[in-house]
Amino acid sequence: MQCLRALLSFFTIIPAGVAKLDFKCAWALPYVVPPLVAGPAAAALWLGASPHVAYLLLLLMTGLNHLDGLADVADALMVRDRERARAVLEDPRRGTGGIFAVVATYAVATASTASPLQLLLAEVFSKALIVTVAAFSKPFKPGLGALFIDGARSTWPLALPALAVIICLRPAATLAALAVALALYAVAYQHLGGANGDVFGYLLEVSRVAYIVTWHM
């Protein structure tokens, strides 16, 4: 129960009252969190809200933590030196790369959003992917990212059924999104020499947007 509360605390805006984060049940991420995060957005879209309103609601339900990771990593990618790039992740100031990444992903996602199911499956896809990828990643520093990697390494096969279902439902879209998301993750991973919480937040955002865009394939 403590582990599930940790998932809610870290991946949603829902207050779970967790004193210590425990990701031993990281495998449950694609099953527990997407309905809570994308469910309200999908319902809003079904009731007639615009894609802009629906996607903003989805982002708010995540607590904006992962969007912050996207912006931080985008800023870090603008710096060639690895140590300086890692330092940029800790800088609270926002650079041009981060601003562009946030605006671009939002614009592309909202322009491509067409159905409630699309939002739900995109969230399941991103959550299943991060568990699987984290299991084969190494942290470049202690922290939440390292804790998540430890949890994912022992449980990641349990997240594969969620990814398999998504692939069966939309094969071309999912495989295309998978290729795009993994390529973008590889760029950040190689540039920074590993992963941390920001890199995983970046992966969550770009993989969700990639799936939303490729949905139309």
UniProtKB/Swiss-Prot annotation:
Single GO MF descriptor: cobalamin 5'-phosphate synthase activity
Pathway the protein takes part in: Cofactor biosynthesis; adenosylcobalamin biosynthesis; adenosylcobalamin from cob(II)yrinate a,c-diamide: step 7/7
Coarse class of the protein's main subcellular location: membrane
EC number: 2.7.8.26
Record bears the keyword Metal-binding: no
GO biological process: cobalamin biosynthetic process
Cofactor field: Mg(2+)
Membrane topology, from the record: Multi-pass membrane protein
Catalytically driven reaction(s): alpha-ribazole + adenosylcob(III)inamide-GDP = adenosylcob(III)alamin + GMP + H(+); alpha-ribazole 5'-phosphate + adenosylcob(III)inamide-GDP = adenosylcob(III)alamin 5'-phosphate + GMP + H(+)
GO cellular component terms given for this protein: plasma membrane
Domain of life (superkingdom): Archaea
Sequence intervals crossing the membrane: 6-26, 39-61, 95-115, 116-136, 162-182
Top EC group: transferase
Alphabetized UniProt keyword annotations: Cell membrane, Cobalamin biosynthesis, Magnesium, Membrane, Transferase, Transmembrane, Transmembrane helix
Compartments in which it is found: Cell membrane
Its job: Joins adenosylcobinamide-GDP and alpha-ribazole to generate adenosylcobalamin (Ado-cobalamin). Also synthesizes adenosylcobalamin 5'-phosphate from adenosylcobinamide-GDP and alpha-ribazole 5'-phosphate.
Family to which this protein belongs: Belongs to the CobS family.
UniProt protein name: Adenosylcobinamide-GDP ribazoletransferase
Organism: Pyrobaculum calidifontis (strain DSM 21063 / JCM 11548 / VA1)
